[in-house]
């Protein structure tokens, strides 16, 4: 078998992804950063090194599998010169190694509970890839699906490698942005950020780079979100919610000089909320919100 030179296929910024020993790898960032290509190449490279290993590739909506992750894995196989070793099945959607019988399995997670009974006849699941993670409903989707494929004990102390790829939503309070922020402190997770600026091997076309440059000039906020992968907010908040903090009691050195009440009365099944808003001598406002139980 010819030796594959991955250095020609993957930008140096992804070295930490290729060589990490952590079981979970989150790749986020802007569009055109090549992160999905990196994962597909890494998965194929690992797959051919393990004759009993299978790979599960997931998207939230099953109808998008064929023209996205299926073709992405197929692209990686062709790019690595391995196409003659595989059978590319369409129904079921599966890419099978002709010699070993192990495969890449593609599933939609329209209903996560339906995947709980999935079994793979030969070998074991060595890797799972959640593509376009921001499309998933929440962390419960991840846990239900991941638990299905990591419950089998692997030989020689191996662990299932779990990949997540996504472009961060604008909203800082979107579940995925908060989830990834939490996982940054988990020793089993590698959080990796990349952008089109990390393309040192010249994969992006001049046309693509020119388009990005125009957005950078004409719409900087959109550019930061779309191509730098920054969480810029929705742009429609009067107040920045990061400045609102829970308070156990009022400070002893700051007296309340004014208080107002407001009520949002519900109708039929809708809740009624009553708010009390205080302003102190130091021009700090405090809010107490009461909801019916």
Region locations from a protein language model:
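Conserved small/polar residues in nucleotide/adenosyl-binding loops
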Residues: 287-293
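Walker B catalytic acidic pair
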Residues: 131-132
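Conserved P-loop
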Residues: 24-90
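Pre-P-loop entry segment of helicase/translocase ATPase cores
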Residues: 1-21
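ATPase catalytic-site recognition across NTP-hydrolyzing enzymes
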Residues: 201-266
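Inter-Walker segment of RecA-like/P-loop motor cores
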Residues: 73-123
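ASCE P-loop NTPase helicase motor core
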Residues: 135-210
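Short beta-strand scaffold segments in enzyme catalytic cores
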Residues: 272-277
């Amino acid at each position: 078998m010819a030796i594959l030179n991955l250095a020609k296929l993957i930008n140096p910024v992804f070295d930490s992804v290729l060589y990490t020993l952590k079981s979970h790898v989150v790749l986020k960032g802007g569009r055109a950063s090549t992160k999905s290509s990196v994962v597909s190449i890494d998965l194929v490279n690992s797959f051919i090194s393990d004759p009993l290993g299978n790979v599960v590739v997931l998207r939230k909506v099953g109808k998008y599998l064929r023209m996205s992750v299926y073709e992405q894995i197929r692209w990686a196989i062709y790019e690595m010169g391995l196409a003659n070793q595989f059978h590319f099945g369409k129904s079921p959607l599966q890419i099978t190694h002709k010699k070993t019988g192990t495969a890449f399995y593609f599933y939609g997670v329209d209903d996560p509970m339906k995947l709980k009974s999935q079994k793979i006849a030969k070998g074991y699941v060595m890797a799972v890839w959640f593509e376009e993670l921001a499309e998933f409903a929440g962390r419960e989707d991840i846990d239900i699906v991941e638990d299905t494929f990591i419950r089998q004990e692997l030989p020689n102390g191996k662990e299932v490698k779990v990949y997540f790829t996504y472009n961060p939503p604008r909203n800082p309070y979107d579940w995925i942005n908060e989830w990834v922020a939490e996982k940054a402190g988990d020793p089993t997770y590698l959080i990796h950020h990349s952008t089109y600026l990390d393309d040192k091997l010249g994969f992006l076309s001049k046309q693509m780079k020119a388009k990005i440059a125009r957005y950078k000039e004409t719409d900087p906020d959109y550019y930061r979100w779309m191509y730098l992968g920054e969480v810029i907010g929705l742009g429609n908040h009067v107040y920045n919610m990061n400045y609102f903090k829970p308070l156990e009691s009022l400070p002893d050195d700051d007296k309340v000089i004014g208080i107002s009440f407001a009520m949002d009365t519900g109708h039929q099944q809708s809740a009624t909320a009553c708010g009390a808003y205080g302003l102190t001598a130091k021009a700090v406002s405090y809010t107490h919100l009461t909801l019916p139980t």
